[in-house]
């Protein structure tokens, strides 16, 4: 990746950590992942997707670091695909509800956030803490392409 593009990404990650009041310290970038989601009308599930997951793990990587921040940069034009929405579960509201209800069943759907349409614009940049649950909904037409990255730092203490 050209140095000037990597610098713009690094600046964006640092600013998001400040703006989001996350203050995650990081000093290592994992290899970027070029991700293609295709519409597959012949398949049982008609489009590529990632189901709910986090990018973080309790495991420390061989380099002594762990994932702290994640990002995705949109490489497709918005009219090149349908579906493929980036979604996340708003952690604070859900965790507060879990604490107040104990073992009661909770409708998690009310805590799901969907990135605005502007996030589908080519070049849009979504940055979030790696522990946030997120997914990409199935692509229902065309092809969605993104560049995904993870930023490592020392384990939390």
Indicate where each model-derived feature is located:
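Fe(II)/2-oxoglutarate oxygenase catalytic core
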Residues: 1-127, 131-157
């Amino acid at each position: 990746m050209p140095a000037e593009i990597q610098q713009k990404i690094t600046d964006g990650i640092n600013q998001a950590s400040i703006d989001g009041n996350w203050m995650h310290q990081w000093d290592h970038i994992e290899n970027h992942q070029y991700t293609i989601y295709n519409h597959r009308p012949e398949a049982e599930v008609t489009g590529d997707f990632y189901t709910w997951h986090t990018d973080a793990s309790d495991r420390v990587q061989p380099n002594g670091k762990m994932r702290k921040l994640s990002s995705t940069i949109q490489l497709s034009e918005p009219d090149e695909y349908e579906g493929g929405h980036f979604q996340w579960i708003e952690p604070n509201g859900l965790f507060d509800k879990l604490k107040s209800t104990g073992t009661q069943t909770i409708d998690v759907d009310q805590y799901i956030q969907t990135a605005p349409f502007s996030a589908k614009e080519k070049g849009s940049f979504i940055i979030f803490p790696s522990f946030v649950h997120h997914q990409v909904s199935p692509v229902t037409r065309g092809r969605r392409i993104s560049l995904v990255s993870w930023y490592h730092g020392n384990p939390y203490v």
